[in-house]
Amino acid sequence: MYLEEQTNKSGVLSCIFSLNEEVGSLAKALRLFEEKGINLTHIESHVSCSKALDEVIDGLRAEITGQVHEMSRNKIKDTVPWFPSNIQDLDRFANQILSYGSELDADHPGFTDPVYRARRKEFADIAYNYRHGQSIPYVEYTEAEKATWGTVFRELKTLYPTHACHEHNRVFPLLEEYCGYREDNIPQLEDISRYLQSCTGFRLRPVAGLLSSRDFLAGLAFRVFHSTQYIRHGSNPMYTPEPDICHELLGHVPLFADPSFAQFSQEIGLASLAAPDEYIEKLATVYWFTVEFGLCKQGNDIRAYGAGLLSSFGELQYALTDKPKLLPFEPEKTILQKYPITEFQPIYFVAESFEDSKEKVRKYAATIPRPFSVRYNAYTQSIEVLDNTQQLRNLANSISEVGILCNALQKMA
């Protein structure tokens, strides 16, 4: 453990508190900080000691002479926020959900349904117990859950040919063929994850609820998409106040099987690593207006590629009418746009192409103030910090493989 030296930081406070032993207790506590606008720079959780909490605190006070401002995993925390350096590090925060999970708000459609709440706890337990490298447990969905899925699947599939982007429509039949996408069947995350890995290297990881923007985007840097496994309440199949398996599998998954879109999504994730908090908010806004609610030009048409649109029958129709305002996607302008969460978007941003958007995100990422650049090493599934000559040599060696590409092109000419 590292204790930072005495500094003059203002408004910084360290605190220790205990929680009841129940699923969702941490999420409840963190929600209080969020409601009061308090920024948490570091969180650690430990199993409760056998001694009373007061005794533990008294012991710490006796041993530590200076005021403790923050604890970090290493000295780099003094200058930049911590970020995962390898794919196993995702285990450290995957269960730090901010809302929902098995705990539902009073206005949630399933709040008064004890059967639904018990079912949500089953899904939450799967996510909480999952660790990288394990197979995602298979789930036997109930007939009621399949009926809800079937309603959403049937309605959306009728719109995809005329409203979804070409990349989505190209992949969707493949998901039906290889991953069990059917009106009467809810596909399994493990099957889909393996298929995505064979297409683009992306994989799914079960999550109990909403992660912070920083944690969620960090997963994308490793080509990991944190996916819910539960389904919306059956009383209103066409509405959900949170991401569910319909949103993940019908909206997100098809595009993660497209190489260009997969690279675009990873670029947003890489840009978030070590970024200051204010830039995380900006990147989250870019993500919202692209990966979630993006439109793109395809020939003379405008099509949807955002998962929030591709999983919402009503908004998918609305977005391609003359009711909303359409603007060209420019990250510097997009980050300034406010957006509603519980209603249709009044403004959408239109991309020229995934490649064009990827380059624009790269250029914007270069403006983020951080003392180094990063790259993802797909062989070791780790993040390389490019801050020394050896790392630059390694990068140069990988670039040298472009010669193989040039040679292949010459032989094909």
What spans do the regions from the language model cover?
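Intein-associated homing endonuclease modules of the LAGLIDADG/DOD-type, together
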Residues: 32, 144, 148, 292-294
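Beta-strand-enriched cores of mature, soluble protein domains
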Residues: 255-269, 273-274
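Extended, Lys/Arg-enriched charged tracts that mediate electrostatic binding to polyanionic substrates
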Residues: 193, 270, 274-306
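A conserved regulatory-domain signal marking ACT and ACT-like small-molecule sensing domains
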Residues: 1-96
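A recognition module on extended beta-rich or small alphabeta surfaces enriched in W/G with H and D/E
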Residues: 308-382
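Non-catalytic, well-ordered alpha-helical scaffold segments
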Residues: 27, 190, 194, 244-247, ...
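The feature captures two recurrent sequence modes
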Residues: 66-256, 351-413
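Short coil/turn segments at secondary-structure boundaries
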Residues: 206-211, 260-264, 278, 301
